[in-house]
């Protein structure tokens, strides 16, 4: 049984030439939405996903706009509104050392080098130079952990544990 990963949600159409507006859920949109790549559209009322090939990708405002080969007008893509774009695990590809997919990090337990449990990674923000991991503490408060060498000392995706050395004031 193939495992599937969300890479985006089609929220609307764009224009009349078959483009769809996507809220991206992928770590690497420029790679995932590259021309010629195959994506799979999962619609609520359909049992089988629809395989589509990316014809074009561009960013407009805060959305990714995608067009698919063979879908060149609004009437053909209207049915995809609300559908999820996914890829099979086999398409994920290898990452360089120190790089991780979001799904590998979200859900990890964060501990200090002294063994104090900080909380669980709930979300990943991508504001610019480095990612920021949103960690929910047991008391419900959130802590923002920058993914930089000075702070993150070890990531073990097998045991879902991240070891950090907090900078002064980071956990306050």
From Swiss-Prot:
A single GO molecular-function term is: ribosome binding
Where is the protein found, in the record's own terms?
Cytoplasm
GO BP terms in the entry = ribosomal small subunit biogenesis; rRNA processing
**A single cellular component GO annotation:** cytoplasm
* Keyword annotations of the record: Chaperone, Cytoplasm, Ribosome biogenesis, rRNA processing
Q: Where is the PRC barrel domain?
A: 96-170
Family note? Belongs to the RimM family.
Among NCBIfam families, the record links this protein to: 16S_RimM
Quote the subunit structure annotation: Binds ribosomal protein uS19.
Role summary: An accessory protein needed during the final step in the assembly of 30S ribosomal subunit, possibly for assembly of the head region. Essential for efficient processing of 16S rRNA. May be needed both before and after RbfA during the maturation of 16S rRNA. It has affinity for free ribosomal 30S subunits but not for 70S ribosomes.
Q: Which PANTHER family match?
A: RIBOSOME MATURATION FACTOR RIMM (PTHR33692:SF1)
Read off the domain note: The PRC barrel domain binds ribosomal protein uS19.
Matching HAMAP family: Ribosome_mat_RimM
The molecule here is called Ribosome maturation factor RimM
Please name the source species: Geobacillus sp. (strain WCH70)
